């Protein structure tokens, strides 16, 4: 937690709790630690499975709104074939973005690929890195953030086309972006 606090002062922090119940004890034991890091992070990505384990009796949407109020600028919740919930500090409404429509082969690495594509897109949009970028992310509109979200979703969609934790290239992602004008932002 000390390392996260130090980094939060200098620049952006991204966090994926990547819940592994066998390593964390009970939800009641894990929840305070996860919430402390969420409050320090700028970008948070969790899966619906992570949230159902941490908060078994609460609607996911309520948890995401509570997390957003604790400090992050951008929160995503991946929901497999049901797409991604997205909340930002600057926009009032929750957005739901559909997944890429592809034939599933293997979900290993899908969440990590989504986060990699998202972070890459946010860096390209100059919304990550410095304290100034951190403030821009906090104030960013959907128009500024959606291209990075689409990049993340496409990256994840390509990953699940292959067996194992496949990592798509930027060229593979850009091919899909070029083919679909609605994804370019």
For each predicted feature, which ranges?
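Conserved beta-alpha-beta core of the PfkB/ribokinase-like small-molecule kinase fold
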Residues: 1-66, 72, 82-84, 89
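Conserved phosphate-binding/catalytic region of the ribokinase-like
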Residues: 56-185
């Amino acid at each position: 937690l000390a390392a996260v606090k130090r980094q939060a002062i200098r620049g952006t922090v991204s966090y994926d709790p990547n819940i592994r119940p066998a390593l964390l004890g009970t939800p009641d034991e894990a929840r305070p630690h996860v919430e402390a890091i969420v409050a320090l992070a700028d970008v948070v990505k969790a899966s619906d499975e992570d949230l159902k384990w941490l908060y078994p009796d609460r609607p996911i949407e309520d948890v995401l709104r509570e997390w957003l109020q604790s400090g992050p600028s951008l929160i995503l919740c991946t929901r497999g074939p049901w797409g991604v919930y997205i909340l930002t500090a600057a926009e009032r409404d929750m957005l739901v973005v559909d997944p890429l429509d592809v034939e599933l082969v293997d979900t290993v690495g899908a969440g990590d690929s989504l986060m990699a594509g998202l972070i890459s897109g946010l860096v390209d949009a100059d919304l990550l890195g410095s304290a100034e970028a951190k403030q821009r992310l906090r104030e960013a509109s959907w128009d500024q953030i959606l291209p990075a979200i689409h990049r993340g979703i496409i990256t994840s969609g390509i990953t699940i086309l292959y067996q194992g934790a496949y990592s798509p290239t930027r060229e593979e992602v850009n091919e899909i972006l070029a083919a679909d004008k609605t994804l370019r932002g």
